[in-house]
Regions:
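Structural recognition of alpha->loop->beta junctions
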Residues: 134-152, 318-330, 386-404
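Radical SAM enzyme core and accessory elements
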Residues: 1-9, 16-26, 82, 86, ...
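Flexible glycine/acidic-rich beta-alpha junction loops that bind and position SAM and/or redox cofactors
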Residues: 16-19, 132, 278-279, 340, ...
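Glycine-rich beta-alpha loop elements in corrinoid/cobalamin-binding modules
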Residues: 51, 55-186, 411
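Residue-level recognition of beta-strand->loop/alpha-helix junctions
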Residues: 69-72, 96, 233, 333, ...
């Protein structure tokens, strides 16, 4: 007889509309590859649900029976996810909750509660931490919210329930008391070196698709100064320091273990800020690099950093060490390629600084994955044009980059935009009508081209085909931008149909389908039936 599950950890994709999808549920891992056209950037993507897997590891280490159901990596529809949850033997369900997917997640919680009235519903993460009072007042279906670090909360909660102890002893927990008043317990932060390594239950699936496994080497951001970022508020509520580090030895030991277990040749250090402060943080980063070299670990390494940090490393000649250690790609939070917007974002750098960093990294053979906010409420079309130009300079492409939008958490709306109701789905999100039109037209192109990209066989796409598809996308942007700039009347429907026809013709030899028949209402695929 199977042992009863003590707790089920649940992840689910953000609302499909937020990712520019068409309300269909595609295989998540396959969809990512298509989005990047299987180029040199897609394998840096970390697809493991790291937070869920890390908490699962701590629970297992404390001898609890844990189930992880992740709607994203398992490509579950809302209905399929509910079906899986109702089949679980658990009475405790801990959900991830995002502002962008709140409605869907709450619906799922209600379905669980409807069929299992005695089930305990918990949630956590940055958004619930910052908005715990509002969420507990609004949703009776949620019983508890973890505040900040969740590593020990679920262990301590289960122990308290099993031992009939007061929940006031469980740190980092918000809940309603017997009178309905919201209580929050004492906050604590965990020592990262004391945590057991992340569970890797999805590792082989991720590796087989060509993606990188992820390793968290720190928590937080040493700077947390970007004006639109939630992190400072999150850390205030959860009483966390700006940044915490794992020791270099601890990090490299996990890397060695992953190499031994999975024979990997690439890894992503998926911190918010791998390098941290310019003194302590960079010393730790260099110590990690030196340990990797000392242990003769040869692999592609992907890290996340800031423009200001890269400037410091350039000035102190640290890039050669980083390259020698195996760093082949750096994700940099540029956020904008406009001086006025960089100032407004409080980035502490200029377009000239960005150019210096880009040139230095490229000279050292390190490619750049750009963190760039293509659209947000106050941008005009020239701001957007400059952002697109940076993508071009970097040689970067993914199908979503033309329609990236700043998702604004509730507590940032009033502070940053003086608009408490601002939402990415509202007609009034964009303050400039031309910017709104540009975004809408680019969204139409994206939604046309993504289903076509999904037809492409990964191993058969060539660099020439990629460059052709990149050029079509850039040309469409230029077409819309130039018409808007000249205040011309235009309709993209026919232009998009013509692009679609050209793309179908170009990719037909490398598609999974036997042929693509372009019809009035789209295309029909006649797939080969393989024995």
């Amino acid at each position: 007889m199977n042992k009863k599950t003590d707790i089920t950890l649940v992840g689910f994709a953000v609302n499909p509309e937020a990712a520019g999808k068409d309300n269909k549920y595609y295989n998540f891992l396959d969809s990512i590859g298509a989005k990047f056209l299987y180029n040199k950037f897609f394998d840096t993507y970390t697809t493991e649900p790291m937070a869920l897997l890390h908490i699962a590891a701590q629970l297992k280490n404390a001898n609890f029976n844990v189930e992880v159901i992740d709607g994203i990596i398992e490509s579950l529809s809302k209905e399929k996810l509910i079906e899986r949850l109702l089949q679980s033997s658990s009475d405790v369900y801990a959900f991830t909750l995002y502002d962008t997917s709140e409605e869907d997640i709450i619906d799922i919680m209600k379905e669980v509660k409807k069929h299992k009235p005695n089930a305990v519903i918990m949630t956590g993460g940055p958004y619930p931490t910052m908005e715990y009072e509002k969420i507990l007042k609004k949703y009776d279906v949620i019983d508890y919210i973890t505040i900040g670090d969740g590593d020990k909360v679920y262990i301590n909660y289960l122990n308290a329930i099993n031992n009939n102890e007061s929940l006031s002893s469980v740190k980092n927990l918000a809940y309603r008391d017997e009178l309905g008043n919201i209580q929050i317990t004492e906050r604590e932060v965990v020592d990262l070196d004391e945590q057991v390594p992340t569970d890797r239950m999805f590792a082989q699936q991720v590796i087989d698709k060509g993606f990188s496994l992820g390793v968290n080497t720190s928590r937080g951001c040493a700077h947390a100064s970007c004006s639109f970022c939630y992190l400072k508020d999150y850390q205030t509520v959860s009483c966390q320091p700006r940044i915490r580090y794992r020791s270099p030895e601890n990090v490299v030991n996990e890397v060695k273990d992953l190499i031994d277990r999975f024979h990997i040749d690439k890894i992503t250090f998926c911190d918010d800020d791998f390098f941290g402060t310019n003194i302590e943080g960079l010393k730790r980063a260099c110590d990690i690099f030196e340990l990797l070299i000392k242990n003769n670990i040869k692999m592609d390494i992907y890290v996340i950093g800031r423009v200001k940090t890269m400037q410091y490393m350039i000035e102190h000649d640290m890039l050669p060490l980083m390259k020698q250690a195996g760093v082949s790609c750096v994700y940099l939070g540029f956020d904008s390629y406009n001086d006025d917007i960089l100032k407004r974002y409080q980035k502490g750098c200029t377009v000239s600084d960005i150019n210096t960093v880009v040139n230095a990294l490229h000279e050292n053979g390190i490619r750049i994955n750009p963190g760039l906010i293509t659209f947000e409420p106050v941008l005009n079309i020239d701001h957007v044009k400059n952002n697109i130009e940076l993508f071009k300079i970097l040689g970067y492409y993914d199908a979503y980059m033309f329609t990236r939008v700043l998702v604004i958490l509730p507590q940032m709306r009033k502070k940053y935009f003086n608009d408490e109701e601002l939402d990415i789905y509202d007609d009034e999100y964009f303050k400039d009508s031309q910017t709104k039109r540009l975004f809408e037209e680019l969204s139409k192109y994206r939604d046309m081209v993504l289903p076509l990209y999904r037809l492409i066989v990964r191993n058969e796409i060539t660099e020439d085909v990629r460059q052709y598809l990149y050029a079509e996308h850039y040309n469409f942007f230029d077409y819309v931008y130039n018409n808007l700039k000249q205040n011309k009347e235009f309709d993209t429907e026919q232009y998009i149909l013509e692009c679609k026809s050209r793309i179908l013709e170009q990719i037909k030899p490398i598609c999974e389908s036997e042929y693509c028949d372009d019809r009035k209402k789209g295309y029909t695929l006649q797939r080969k039936i393989k024995n």
